[in-house]
Swiss-Prot record:
It comes from Klebsiella pneumoniae subsp. pneumoniae (strain ATCC 700721 / MGH 78578). Catalyzes the deamination of dCTP to dUTP. Homotrimer. Belongs to the dCTP deaminase family. It holds the Pfam family DCD. It catalyses: dCTP + H2O + H(+) = dUTP + NH4(+). DCTP binds at residues 110-115, 128, 136-138, 171, 178, 182. One of its GO terms (biological process) is dUTP biosynthetic process. The active site is at residue 138. It is an enzyme of class 3 (hydrolase). The lineage of its organism: Bacteria, Pseudomonadati, Pseudomonadota, Gammaproteobacteria, Enterobacterales. It comes from the Bacteria. One of its GO terms (molecular function) is nucleotide binding. This is dCTP deaminase.
C-alpha cells in the first residue's frame, strides 16, 4: 500500500523520509510528491565506440563507457537543455531524497510530458530502501521535435510504499552500492557489476 498525501507529510514531519528542499504542500498530491528537474546533465557522444559489450571484460566496458559518455554539463540559470528526437541523456532531480530502510520509492514521469514523447526514466524507476541522493533521470525523446528542458520545471512524481519490515541490506549499507550519495548525472557504472 502506498503512502497517501497525509502520510507523506507525516513521514516528512517525523524525519522518517527526507526530501531536500522540502516540497511545499502544493506539490504533495494524493499519493505523490512532484519533483523538479535539476541543472546537471550528461549526454552520449555519437560514433566514439562501435559498440559496448555489456558482458565483456570490465576494463573494455569501462574504456567504452569513458569514450561514449560526456562530461557532466551544468546549465547556468535560465538556460535550456535541448533533447532531440531519438536522443538519450541523463539528468538529475533538483531534490535530494533519503529513504529509510523500510520504505521503497517509485518515480513516474508526467503524463503531459509523455504525450510529447519524453520518457523520464527508461526503465529504472525504483528508489531502493536506504537510498540517499538526487535521482538520476534517464531521458529519451521518442517524439518528432526537440524538447527544451529547463532546470526547475516539474519533471516527475515520487510515490512511496512501506515494506513489511526494514530491509536487511538497504542501499546505504551495501558494499556494492555503485551510486551511493549521488548528486550529479552519474554515468552508468555497469563495469562495476
Amino acid at each position: 500500500m502506498r503512502l497517501c498525501d497525509r502520510d507523506i507529510e507525516a513521514w516528512l514531519d517525523e524525519g522518517r523520509l527526507a526530501i531536500n528542499p522540502r516540497p511545499p504542500v502544493e506539490r504533495i498530491n494524493g499519493a505523490t510528491v512532484d519533483v523538479r528537474l535539476g541543472n546537471k546533465f550528461r549526454t552520449f557522444r555519437g560514433h566514439t565506440a562501435p559498440f559496448i559489450d555489456l558482458s565483456g571484460p570490465k576494463a573494455e566496458v569501462s574504456a567504452a563507457l569513458d569514450r561514449v559518455m560526456s562530461e557532466e554539463i551544468v546549465l547556468p540559470e535560465g538556460e535550456a537543455f535541448f533533447l532531440h528526437p531519438g536522443e538519450l541523456a541523463l539528468a538529475v532531480t533538483y531534490e535530494s531524497v533519503t529513504l529509510p530502510a523500510d520504505l521503497v520509492g517509485w518515480l513516474d514521469g508526467r503524463s503531459s510530458l509523455a504525450r510529447l514523447g519524453l520518457m523520464v526514466h527508461v526503465t529504472a524507476h525504483r528508489i531502493d530502501p536506504g537510498w540517499s541522493g538526487c535521482i538520476v533521470l534517464e531521458f529519451y525523446n521518442s517524439g518528432k521535435l526537440p524538447l527544451a528542458l529547463r532546470p526547475g520545471m516539474p519533471i516527475g512524481a515520487l510515490s512511496f510504499e512501506p515494506l513489511s519490515g526494514p530491509a536487511a541490506r538497504p542501499y546505504n549499507r551495501r558494499e556494492d552500492a555503485k551510486y551511493r550519495d549521488q548528486q550529479g548525472a552519474v554515468a552508468s557504472r555497469i563495469d562495476k557489476d
